[in-house]
From Swiss-Prot:
InterPro entries: GTPase_ArgK (IPR005129), P-loop_NTPase (IPR027417). One of its GO terms (cellular component) is cytoplasm. It comes from the Bacteria. Pfam families: MeaB. GO terms for molecular function: GTP binding; GTPase activity. This is Uncharacterized protein in mutB 3'region. It comes from Streptomyces virginiae. PANTHER family: METHYLMALONIC ACIDURIA TYPE A PROTEIN, MITOCHONDRIAL, METHYLMALONYL-COA MUTASE. Coiled coil: none annotated. Belongs to the SIMIBI class G3E GTPase family. ArgK/MeaB subfamily. Gene3D superfamilies: 1.20.5.170, P-loop containing nucleotide triphosphate hydrolases.
Length: 93
């Protein structure tokens, strides 16, 4: 997943054709996903809420993916985080 994201975001000419090929293969499989954005100040309970919501959804038979981004990253403008430690119950499902 990380390699695919890097490839698609790359500005290198040699990556453009590969990124287009990847997106062409994935696009037919992308129509059924629901996307939800959660935002808030640090400490407000975003990870706790996502954990509880995710556990509820997986208990109903749904599949859940979490992509957590920190937009305050000065180097990248939005680093992708690994919040598995904050979403312990969901990481077990």
């Amino acid at each position: 997943m990380a390699r695919a994201i890097t490839l698609v975001e790359s500005t290198r000419p040699q990556h453009r054709a590969l990124a287009q090929e990847l997106l062409t293969e994935l696009l037919p499989h992308s129509g059924r996903a629901r996307r939800v954005g959660i935002s808030g100040v640090p400490g407000v309970g975003k990870s706790t809420f996502i954990d509880a919501l995710g556990v509820m959804l997986t208990s109903l038979g749904h599949r859940v993916a979490v992509l957590a981004v920190d937009p305050s990253s000065t180097r990248t403008g939005g680093s992708i985080l690994g919040d598995k430690t904050r979403m312990e119950r969901l990481s077990l499902d």
